[in-house]
């Protein structure tokens, strides 16, 4: 009690230290209860689908996060007394991949889930919090469209477990494999690939058209790249979109990526997901990290995606255990205010 009183006095005398660091927050009382209810609801649905929880450490070798999407550039780093470069947890998937590759090697398939916070550096101007609350699942050792469909179905079930009805849930599905094949066929440099990714991600059709006209040689690859800035299509409209994309495929790699996406969509449709599926070939984030299926989750009332994931078949190999994997994470900061868990 005396220590608490002393700390309170120190806080009053030093108001700069009284607030949590920029981009973080205290969760008190009802906010804490709501978060725990949501986490419990998600844990139930994950375990009902055969997933087991793993709890990675909150601090890792910085090298682990160098394998994450973005290369770990936004990880908060520190050097310990032995001179080791460490980082606060910036990405759960990289940690789960490390666990699967080093602790659970040879066990397939693995169905693992997690919940907790990640910490990433961000500027005050961006409005993006440094600390973000997440929960998610990873399926390791399964490569087929059935595994992709399983994760899409579990993502939809997760939203439903939080009280988000099917009519208020939407999953935008694409494949980074098609975009990778297009930029390879176009001979795009890293600089051009980044510029194309940015224009496609913003759905900037005029800007993308101008960029392609100036820097991409005429041909199927250029026409297909421009098409990627089009709005998402409903699943009912997807066949026409995929057919057009196939016609513009500059080679077998692009065609194969589209076929894998079509197979995953067919398998997902057979599962009656309980969420509206949209096909968005402009889902091109995570180039160099994701290898096939990519998707974002949306909920009515949220201004941005509330989760996302995809297939990352090369990540475990970077830890010495090459196995395919697919997974997703949920943004609990965005979902908890919307949730009505049962």
Outline where the language-model segments fall.
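Short acidic (Asp/Glu) and glycine-rich catalytic loops that position anionic groups and cofactors
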Residues: 20-22, 72-75, 204, 220, ...
